[in-house]
Design a protein with these regions (language model features):
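Metal-dependent catalytic core segments for phosphate chemistry
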Residues: 2-22, 309, 316-349, 433-436, ...
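Conserved catalytic alpha/beta cores of large enzymes that bind or transform nucleotide phosphates
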Residues: 42, 46-47, 56, 295-320, ...
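Short alpha-helix plus adjacent loop in nuclease-associated cores
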Residues: 17-24, 67-111
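Short active-site loop/helix that positions an aromatic residue
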Residues: 49-61, 71-80, 90-93, 195-201, ...
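Conserved, non-catalytic sequence blocks in retroelement Pol enzymes and Pol-derived host proteins
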Residues: 79, 187, 332-334
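Conserved "right-hand" nucleotidyltransferase catalytic core of DNA-directed polymerases
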Residues: 1-24, 28, 35-38, 47-49, ...
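Conserved catalytic core of nucleic-acid polymerases
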Residues: 142, 149, 261-262, 267-269, ...
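Short, polar/flexible loop-turn hinges at active-site or ligand-entry regions and domain interfaces
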Residues: 22, 61-63, 96-104, 120-130, ...
């Protein structure tokens, strides 16, 4: 709701406290604010524009003349921060201490808003992020606000039906687990599950914790081929989580208009990706059929409309081809070749038409593994082959695409030197891990740099 608004206009900071405005004068105040915010000739620099646009839209006020968002700009300059309070930005970038508390603190900070804007704008220009800011990030602000306001319609009846199906599926899976273990126990209890797996069923102990046997996802994955109950337990965990987080969870956040209004966060991830919260609608697992069923409860607003799902084809590899300038990979894409089949043909030394689905699958793992900085050991684990075979696959790959290895090495060196890497549009991805004295953490940093 519209609570307080702080405005620096004509070198004067004003605080509008809407809670103190009586009903008689509230319409007049709203109309004055509307005239100010909708005046295109008054250029506006806003701290957290999406939030303000979202709030004002509810009061039928449009924001015109919005030229700069200090939060988004500060995020582009340093995406490693968790948040970007105005007084902190002024302290860090303008070397000014902002004094006071509450309203006084914010008003004192607002007094330096113009100076902060000029500093951030200059940094964005000097660091070559003007295209990224003005053509990508700034236009996105109003789009995200609109997305949040519209929301995503949900078929409540379908969701209720799904709740029944999940309850039945969970019950059925529980019975199968009990039958395989020949007793009932609390499957959700790591302690009880550990005793069943490692004492009663005598499965090999992979890892121990202070409280007993570890039964985390990594441990269960390694036990998959040891007993049929393990796969059932992994499935049970998936569907119970899906049920609590999405089936029951979504019921609680459906608004009066029949839609779910998630928040889309532009300044949270270090990579520039969006994040979704309250609830997270970007991470609904689709590995199992029950997960795919959840997506079907989302429907278009109009019955005559359809939901369209689009995805880039092999985008990571296309970007890699562009950034590395590897002629062989660029040529493969320009001739519309299936890059995974092409790689399989090279790795396994067979004609393209003789590449089997298994060969293509392994080549795909190599292609994407290289992008994410995979080691020969990890590749051997993923493909269930020897480390020597994995190393040979990677060697053949780099022989076929010679510029890629050099490019990836240069990216790692740049990250070590600068502490960050750059994307095509000069977005900075800060990687503090790469300067760690811990070898494992440093290796993670190198993979993140290539990623």
């Amino acid at each position: 709701e519209l609570d307080k608004l702080y405005i620096n206009y004509g070198d004067k900071v004003s605080l509008i406290d809407f809670k103190l405005i009586n009903m008689e004068n509230s319409n007049e105040a709203i109309n004055l604010l509307k005239a100010f915010m909708e005046d295109k000739n008054i250029e506006k620099v806003i701290q957290d524009g999406k939030n303000l646009i979202t709030i004002l839209t509810k009061h039928d006020i449009q924001v015109e003349g919005f030229i700069f968002d200090t939060v988004v700009a500060a995020y582009l300059i340093d995406s490693a921060k968790s948040n970007y309070p105005l007084e902190v930005l002024i302290n860090e970038y303008l070397m000014k201490e902002v004094k006071g508390e509450g309203d006084e603190l914010i008003c004192n900070a607002m007094a330096s808003m113009k100076e902060l804007y000029e500093y951030l704008k200059d940094r964005i220009d000097k660091e070559g992020m003007d295209e990224l800011y003005y053509e990508v990030e700034h236009p996105l602000i109003s789009i995200l606000s609109s997305m949040e306001a519209i929301g995503f319609n949900v078929n409540r009846e379908k969701l209720d039906e799904l709740a029944v199906k999940f309850k039945e599926e969970i019950s059925r899976t529980e019975k199968e687990i009990y039958e395989l273990c020949e007793e009932e126990f609390n499957i959700s209890s790591p302690k009880q599950l550990g005793k069943i797996l490692f004492e009663k069923l005598d499965l090999p102990v992979i890892k121990k914790t202070k409280t007993g046997y570890s039964t985390n996802a990594e441990v269960l994955e390694k036990l998959m081929d040891k007993h049929p109950v393990v796969e059932k337990i992994i499935y049970y965990r998936q569907i119970t989580k899906l049920n609590s987080t999405y089936v029951e969870g979504l019921k609680n956040v459906i608004d009066e208009d029949g839609a779910i209004h998630s928040s889309f966060n532009q300044t949270v991830t270090t990579t520039g990706r969006l994040s979704s919260t309250e609830p997270n609608l970007q991470n609904i697992p689709v590995k199992y059929e029950m997960g795919r069923e959840i997506r079907k409860v989302f429907i278009p607003q109009e019955s005559t409309d359809v939901l369209l799902s689009c995805d880039y084809s092999q985008i990571e590899l296309r970007v890699l081809a562009h950034m590395s300038d590897d002629k062989n990979m660029i040529d493969a894409f320009n001739h519309h070749s299936d890059i995974h089949t092409k790689t399989a043909s090279e790795v396994f030394k067979v004609p393209v038409e003789e590449v089997t689905p298994l060969m293509r699958s392994r080549a795909k793992a190599v292609n994407f593994g290289i992008v994410y900085g995979i080691s020969d050991f990890s590749l051997s684990q993923d493909l269930k082959i020897t480390r020597k075979e994995a190393a040979e696959y990677m060697e053949i790959y780099f022989d076929r695409y010679p510029k890629i290895k050099g490019y990836l090495e240069s990216v790692k060196e740049e990250a070590k030197e600068k502490g960050y890497v750059l994307t095509v549009l000069n977005r900075r991805r800060f990687i503090p891990e790469i300067k760690s004295s811990n070898k494992i953490v440093k290796a993670l940093g190198e993979r993140l740099a290539m990623n």
